Amino acid sequence: MKEIGNRESGIVDGQRNGASVGSDPTALPIPHSPLPIPGAHARPPRIALIAGEASGDILGAGLIEQLRLRYPNAEFVGIGGDAMRGVGCQTWFDASELAVMGLTEVLRHLPRLLKLRSAFRERVLAWKPDVFIGIDAPDFNLPVERWLKQRGIKTVHYVSPSVWAWREKRAEKIGVSADLVLCLFPMEPPIYARHGVDARFVGHPMADDIAYQADRAAARATLGLSASSTVLAVLPGSRHGEISRLGDTFFQAAWLVSEHLPNLHVLVPAANPGCKQLLAEQLSRSSLPVMRSHLLDGQARTAMLAADVVLLASGTATLEAMLVKRPMVVGYKVAPLTYRIVKLLGLLKVNRYALPNILANDDLAPELMQDDCAPERLCVALLDWFKHPDKVAALQPRYLALHAQLRRDASARAADAVAGLLEGRDSEVGIWDSAGAKA
């Protein structure tokens, strides 16, 4: 899920332990006591975690920090990266060992991954943790959670799979594996409640980290752009397959926009060196002026902050664009066979794809999918934002309301829920409202 917790100096700030961030006077206070929660442990709590990718590593670090406020002598072990190690987690394996993507790569590494999973669960069982927390990575974590739960260890799954979008019955299987599910979005706990699974809405860490009023001027200064520049950010995805399907289409759309806005600057953040090479090849094939096309190393949030409008692939980046309050156009394509199968079997249960639209239950951003994701149609949608600042202004309060809904001091709420499980409190199944309270 995913640049959760990404910080770019001078551009974003955060909120911890109830400190106010941003300038929205209607924002709800988030009081959380840093005092340890009393418990009856004969020894300090032992907490094992697995984070299988960079975003999970950052989530895990925030959770560990908050749990340590409640249990200063707690011990933390597991699979993680630099962020989790930085807050005192002893990692038996590095998170990079789980970072495989795509069916072919997964199949190639499957024997190693199965061996690693078996070794980890035997070692963690011998360590006798009080709770195990699997962070995202459901294909790896849920079997570990189920195996440990069968042996009497309390289990938590942090970051729900998208049960609201497709295969809702997965909620039942997740409940077999996890005693508690920690959800980033408010529409998720009611789905789990229908299946008898305890799930809590804790908020989204990205909403905690991004200021209510983001600073466009600072972002433009960081990138060497003037305040008067006309700027489009283009983000065709963070994976090779996404970029291969969307990049040329997006850059052709950007060129069409530049025909109407001759001084347009185009910002293209690359998630990693492999993506950068592919994006550079696509840019070289496009008709975009070299002097006004800026290929960046990372800096996706800075690029979105600096932009007037954002063109991006459907995914977590749409949430980030909403949180920095930028109008966007969302495009996406999947392999034609995959699309036909999904449509034929009716696997998708939502009629919107972009997270801001799903959260608002409204069409805040144009969505152009599959055959509709064509340069000409993308150009029309982008120009509509550039040429109608009144529409952009009307969008801001909608974005702000969604931001406030998600901004709940997620790490602290997640730690409270884990502490409740450890202490045997709030263990009954229930529906949890958008503020994270029992309905």
From Swiss-Prot:
Q: Which SUPFAM superfamilies match?
A: UDP-Glycosyltransferase/glycogen phosphorylase
Catalytic activity field: a lipid X + a UDP-2-N,3-O-bis[(3R)-3-hydroxyacyl]-alpha-D-glucosamine = a lipid A disaccharide + UDP + H(+)
Picking any one GO biological process from the record gives:
lipid A biosynthetic process
Cellular compartments per GO CC: membrane
List, in alphabetical order, the Gene Ontology terms for molecular function in this entry: lipid-A-disaccharide synthase activity; phospholipid binding
Q: Where is this region: Disordered?
A: 1-35
Look at the named UniProt entry and state the broad enzyme category this protein falls under: transferase
Extract the NCBIfam families matched here.
lpxB
Name assigned to this protein: Lipid-A-disaccharide synthase
User: Source gene?
Assistant: lpxB
